[in-house]
Design a protein with these regions (language model features):
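Glycine- (often His-adjacent) and acidic-residue-rich active-site loop
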Residues: 57-91, 110, 140-142
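Glycine-rich beta-to-alpha active-site loop
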Residues: 58, 89, 94-141, 145, ...
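Structural preference for long, well-ordered alpha-helical segments in enzyme cores
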Residues: 37-40, 44, 117, 323, ...
Length: 704
């Protein structure tokens, strides 16, 4: 017999509906649950003993997480997307027009379709539990709220508040949701059912009248201004690459100017267009990829991992301090070592600064900041490292230095302690050469700034023990990172794939292209920053050093132009030296440092380069190297390559990652473009053998 999602209890006329989808950690709005809910609503309409209804969750920290996202992957046309949206409208229209008042009792996450269900209820009560959050994150999947949320929310709280929620996808804590008018009441978790039941009785008896702000008069008068500003803001932030926020603005604008029924029809058509589009499909694929890597971590299932309670960090620079701050935030005690008190002081100051940023945004209190800082103890020696579960080395990118600190660490730590290098390019096996415990050594490549960048690349050598790998991966997930596991090799995946992309930007500069034209072309393509700006952030000296490591292993395709050494010798190390391709004079708007051109061939004489030519050269250099990483076994799967590129390197999410993008264009088209570039620019554009094979056989990287 099929298990039911709902259980019922009639409390003297108030029907308590408890939603607990069987066999799932969270409640989702799947087809079976929706059908059962609709049948219950029909029964309520005919049952005079029911005077009011309370809907609550049987899950401990979740009300409803939203729709079953797998259903979105089955949409093959705009018409199918419209039908799915209209089905949601039908059930929530029935809920909204129910014979008796319905109260949503919200505890835990209430997102997407869960929020839309609550909006169709007469009254909403939420707990003040920290895990309670209410939001409409559909825009993050390239969609809009398609079950009535794009119409009901603005009618409830007004245009400005609803647009902010819908366009950002941000979820609100209960207190903010109350202030915004999204919920009607907030209470402690233990009394949620009592408060919701009392509200249901009050509504049924006419004693309780919910407050409804609606669309304020000021917003009605300023409608054109509000929508114009919202549209301009979206285009500025997204470059117009994401259609969902623009569709959302249009749906709210048109929907609130007509009846709810007509507004819902506008919403359904927009949802249909988006759900069948390439951007939504790409973003949904990224979502599933991030879920899959949590289950497939590159080591046997059931491998025991050390629970990291004490962490040692070697180096108090931006990376070391960032790692220490991330660890302390999740309750890990950190021992941070550097060579001088001055360096340690700068590291602690940096951590404090990142925490204070969060305090100013009210996501931390002063007490929280103090507790996190108290978990980090600075040191000039290895005292305290003997009790560490994991050591992360974040010293300068120098092989001999890294070998020395590894040897010192092994002498100061327990046998089972795991040692991780944060190197961005040096093979881990070379660092571990001659060490006493190679099975406990691996790489943990963080990205800067650590508190903002969501990727962690864990590098395993052939000798790395599964237990050590499990410990590193577990720690990475604990601090909130998307973790990919790659095989050891020069540059691993991310640095190796990024290098030809950055190199090509420098080659363009030596051929006469202007700095701003290159950066503008790549931000227009969808990258958050241009490659020349990124070189200034990384440091041209670092790029040159990495380039030399990669050339040793991969030959001339990784070579930077000779002018690179000239620029490094001139002290053009980027932001850190306040001298690079751009000026760093304290002004908000950066300017190109025109004097850099005197160090390049053709001097200050610049030529116009077509945006498409810039994009083709840089993007195909990147795509080809990504395929070579898969071909060489550095990457375990195309999925990992997509996740790594998007969350570590800024590859445009709306393209789904390099391998999804190649699937979309077709391997044959990619090989053709690479051959064209090879004919113009030389052997560095030679297509990967794997890509040529796939073109011949008509295969794709992903099954669907």
């Amino acid at each position: 017999m099929e298990q039911k999602a709902f259980t019922r209890f009639n409390d003297e006329g108030v029907l308590i509906l408890t939603l607990d989808v069987p066999g799932e950690k969270v409640n989702t709005l799947g087809q079976g649950m929706i059908a059962e809910f609709e049948a219950i609503l029909d029964e309520i309409g005919e049952d005079d003993s029911v005077k009011a209804v309370v809907i609550r969750s049987g899950k401990p920290d979740n009300f409803i997480a939203g729709a079953d996202i797998k259903e979105f992957t089955r949409i093959s046309s705009a018409e199918e997307g419209e039908a799915l949206s209209r089905a949601g409208h039908a059930i929530f229209d029935k809920l909204e027009s129910a014979r008796v008042p319905v109260v949503a009792a919200i505890n835990g996450t209430c997102l997407g379709g869960g929020t839309e269900l609550s909006l169709a209820c007469r009254y909403r009560v939420a707990t003040d539990d920290p895990k309670t959050s209410i939001g409409l994150p559909e825009v993050m999947l390239g969609l809009i709220p398609g079950a009535g949320g794009s119409n009901r929310l603005p009618r409830l709280v007004g245009l400005v508040k609803s647009l902010d929620m819908i366009l950002t996808g941000r979820a609100l804590r209960a207190s903010r949701a109350l202030k915004a008018g999204v919920v009607d009441e907030v209470c402690p978790r233990p009394i949620l059912l009592d408060v919701a039941t009392r509200a249901a009785r009050g509504l049924a008896e006419g004693r309780l009248k919910p407050r409804r702000a609606g669309i304020p008069l000021k917003e009605r008068l300023l409608r054109p201004v509000i929508f114009k500003k919202a549209r301009a803001s979206v285009i500025k932030k997204t470059g117009g690459h994401y259609p969902a926020p623009l569709e959302a603005i249009d749906v709210v604008r048109r929907g609130t100017a007509t009846s709810l029924a007509e507004g819902l029809e506008i919403e359904a058509r927009a949802f249909g267009r988006l759900s069948a589009g390439n951007v939504s499909r790409a973003l949904v694929s990224v979502f599933f990829a991030t879920q899959e890597i949590k289950k497939d971590a590159g080591y046997p299932k059931g491998t025991p991992a050390r629970d990291v309670e004490k962490l040692g960090v070697l180096g108090a620079g931006l990376m070391g301090a960032g790692i220490a701050g991330a660890a302390s935030t999740v309750g890990v005690r950190v021992r941070m070592k550097d060579a001088t008190n001055e360096a340690l002081g700068r590291g602690l100051k940096y951590v404090r600064g990142t925490l204070e940023e969060r305090r100013k945004r009210r996501s931390l209190t002063r007490l929280d900041v103090g507790q996190r800082l108290d978990r980090i103890s600075p040191t000039l020696d290895y005292r305290g490292f003997g009790r560490a579960d994991l050591i992360i080395e974040a010293v300068f990118e120098d092989l001999q230095l890294k070998r020395r600190v590894l040897a010192e660490t092994e002498a100061a730590t327990a046998e089972e302690c795991v040692f991780a290098s944060n190197t961005s390019s040096i093979p881990i096996a070379e660092i571990a050469k001659g060490c006493r415990r190679p099975s406990r050594v691996l790489g943990m490549h963080f990205f800067s700034p650590v508190h903002k960048m969501p990727l962690l690349e864990v590098i395993a050598t052939p000798e790395t023990a599964p237990e050590a790998l499990a410990t590193a991966v577990g720690f990475g997930r604990r601090i909130g990172k998307h973790v990919i596991v790659v095989r050891d090799g020069p540059g691993f995946y991310t640095t190796r794939a990024l290098s030809p992309y950055l190199n090509e930007a420098v080659w363009l500069l030596t051929e006469g292209a202007a700095v701003e034209d290159i950066d503008r072309a790549m931000t227009a393509f969808g990258y958050p920053v241009g490659p020349v700006t990124l070189l200034d952030e990384v440091g041209l000296d670092v790029a040159a050093k990495i380039g030399k490591v990669l050339v040793q292993h991969f030959g001339d395709r990784m070579a930077l132009p000779p002018a690179t050494d000239t620029m490094v010798a001139d002290g053009r190390l980027g932001r850190k030296s306040k001298k690079g391709f751009y000026t760093y004079d304290g002004r908000k708007k950066k300017r190109v440092d025109e004097t850099v051109y005197s160090l390049l061939p053709d001097g200050t004489k610049r030529r116009s380069v077509a945006t498409r030519d810039v994009q083709d050269r840089l993007v195909f250099a990147f795509l080809n190297e990504a395929v070579l990483c898969l071909q060489d076994g550095v990457l375990r799967s195309p999925r990992d390559g997509d996740v790594g590129a998007i969350f570590g390197l800024g590859f445009p999410p709306f393209l789904g990652g390099p391998f999804r993008y190649l699937d979309r264009m077709g391997a044959g088209a990619a090989v053709g473009q690479l051959e064209k570039l090879r004919g113009i620019h030389g052997a560095r554009f030679r297509p990967a053998a794997m890509l040529e094979d796939m073109a011949r056989e008509g295969r794709s990287f992903h099954a669907a």
